[in-house]
């Protein structure tokens, strides 16, 4: 964690982790910390978003301080790579999976039992298209996707040419916005700034300049407390609607809103059967999006 937090902030952050860990500890049964078996090493995968970092380091604190575990943190990319790593025993636990990464990549691993879903982490995730509230006040029709039609040029950027810019998310995230734009018949060019920090830098700069910006975003996310953002209403979901643009299918099949996601905890089959006291703790782990955002905000500085 030393690469994430400067020395001047380490002690306050340790106190925050301790406080968050206490809240998590109180939320689970005392039996989660029982058992004579030694904990051993637990490998937790930290994904690239801030909420996952908060999950990982609060759990790490509890497991090390209360159960005597040795916790190793990995950073394997969301999707197929981390399901394969879990199958191969390189990852024991993931504390925030967005519905088996939103697509088909994880389903075979769950079906064959090599990856075990052990319940919700207590948080519901939302993905969508977002604009600043100041823009909605100027253009009330932007409340829905239909209001964007014919007004795309308002969002023009150097990269988008004559089209409006839609700022896509971190390329490692499962998304469908290229297909969604096509399916809705909107005149946007999908532009990628890079990983999430680069995307945030781009849209937050435009926000501070009070310029138009439309972008992929999600909740919970601690930055949502710092920026007044509004989710654009997309078409309602329909049977057969697709959510991963890597899936085959006509663009019309992607022309619906993202679903809400119950954020699951996952374990490898080997770890789930290990008898480690950490297994019981992870199964019982839950906290709120408010708690997660609070810790994520402090970690991010």
Model-derived regions, located:
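Short, well-ordered beta-strand elements
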Residues: 37-51, 69-75, 163-167, 282
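Ligand-binding pocket segment of bilobal, Venus flytrap-like solute-binding proteins
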Residues: 83-85, 91-95, 165-243, 247
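C-terminal region of N-terminal signal peptides and the immediate post-cleavage residues
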Residues: 24-38
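A conserved helix-loop-strand patch within extracytoplasmic ligand-binding domains
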Residues: 114-166
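Bacterial N-terminal signal peptides that target proteins for export
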Residues: 2-17
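Short, polar/charged alpha-helical segment
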Residues: 51-69, 181
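Pocket-flanking alpha-helical
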Residues: 56, 74-113, 202, 222-227
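A bilobed periplasmic-binding-protein/Venus flytrap-type ligand-binding module shared by bacterial periplasmic
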Residues: 127-137, 262-274, 281, 297-298
């Amino acid at each position: 964690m030393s690469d994430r937090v400067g020395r001047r902030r380490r002690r306050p952050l340790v106190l925050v982790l301790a406080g968050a860990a206490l809240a998590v500890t109180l939320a689970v049964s005392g039996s989660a910390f029982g058992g004579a078996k030694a904990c051993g090493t637990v490998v937790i995968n930290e994904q690239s978003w801030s909420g996952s970092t908060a999950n990982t380091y609060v759990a790490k604190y509890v497991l090390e301080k209360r159960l005597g575990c040795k916790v190793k943190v990995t950073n394997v990319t969301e999707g197929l790579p981390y399901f394969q790593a879990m199958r191969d025993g390189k990852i024991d636990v993931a504390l925030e999976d967005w519905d088996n990464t939103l697509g088909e990549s994880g389903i075979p691993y769950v079906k064959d039992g090599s990856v075990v879903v052990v319940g919700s982490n207590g948080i519901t995730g939302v993905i969508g298209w977002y604009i600043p509230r100041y823009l909605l006040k100027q253009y009330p029709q932007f409340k829905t996707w239909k209001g964007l039609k014919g007004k795309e040029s308002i969002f023009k950027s150097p990269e988008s040419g004559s089209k409006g810019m839609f700022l896509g998310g971190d390329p490692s995230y499962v998304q469908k916005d290229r297909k969604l734009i096509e399916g809705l018949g909107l005149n946007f060019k999908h532009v990628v700034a890079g990983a999430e920090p680069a995307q945030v830098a781009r849209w937050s700069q435009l926000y501070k300049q009070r310029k138009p910006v439309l972008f992929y975003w999600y909740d919970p996310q601690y930055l949502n407390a710092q920026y007044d953002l509004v989710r654009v209403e997309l078409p309602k979901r329909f049977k057969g609607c697709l959510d991963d643009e890597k899936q085959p299918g006509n663009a019309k099949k992607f022309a619906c809103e993202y679903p809400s996601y119950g954020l699951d905890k996952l374990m490898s089959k080997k770890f789930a059967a290990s008898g480690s006291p950490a297994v019981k703790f992870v199964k019982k782990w839950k906290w709120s999006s408010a708690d997660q955002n609070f810790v994520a905000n402090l970690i991010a500085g």
